[in-house]
Amino acid sequence: MNKTVELVKQWGIFEEKHPDGSIEDFCRYLLIHQRESESKLPLAGGVIPMIPAGLLLKLIGRINRLNMNYAYSALEGTGLNQLEEFGMLLYVQQEKNPRKTDVIHAHLLELSSGTDMLNRLKSRGFIAEQTDREDKRSKRLQLTASGEQAIEKGIQRVKKMATMMTHHMAEEDMLLCIKLLKGIDQKFSALFSSHKGKSFDEAYGEVMESTVSNF
């Protein structure tokens, strides 16, 4: 096949899958697709899912679990015990004076477990709590000086951990992964709260129906 025709064909395939993708994304896609087709690295972790979607989610889940486990040791000496605590402090720092429930929902936590985690951070002196002036039923959070210090210590450790976990990847590969996966994160982060209390079949039906209606 003529190389120009083949290139146009590959662009059509890419554009259909990633309509917002740039030419730079397409070039990364071609290079990685070629490289991965030649890769013979075995997969870790036992049973291999039967469909690509299952394998992708399994890999994401395993990497996340490994990341969480390394975080326990990486955060030693910072006053923080897990990545969720570090993430919550960062959220409070960035949002300045967020509502307690907003912090919990932003981290996709159940209200009870999220409240417990925030209470532990409060008891360690990392955050302070005050009543919302506009809604007396709500609480707002503020970072303390100790919380700022914990973030300063933690951010260096988390950066080192992220570098360690991805040191074998080229930056363009990471950027492409972000480009390809952020749509899933955005979509289901928006849907997650509305799916609480519904059966899986109901959630599945809503997602698939909206997908079909967009074509």
State the predicted function of each range.
Residues 1-78:
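N-terminal leader segment of winged-helix/HTH proteins
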Residues 2, 120-175:
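Charged, amphipathic alpha-helical coiled-coil/dimerization segments
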Residues 60, 64, 92-93, 144, ...:
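Generic structural concept
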Residues 69, 86, 159-160:
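A generic alpha-helix surface/boundary motif
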Residues 71-75, 79, 107, 169, ...:
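Long, hydrophobic, amphipathic alpha-helical segments used as structural scaffolds
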Residues 72-109, 113:
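N-terminal helix-turn-helix DNA-binding core of bacterial DNA-binding proteins
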Residues 158-215:
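Terminal interaction helix/tail motif
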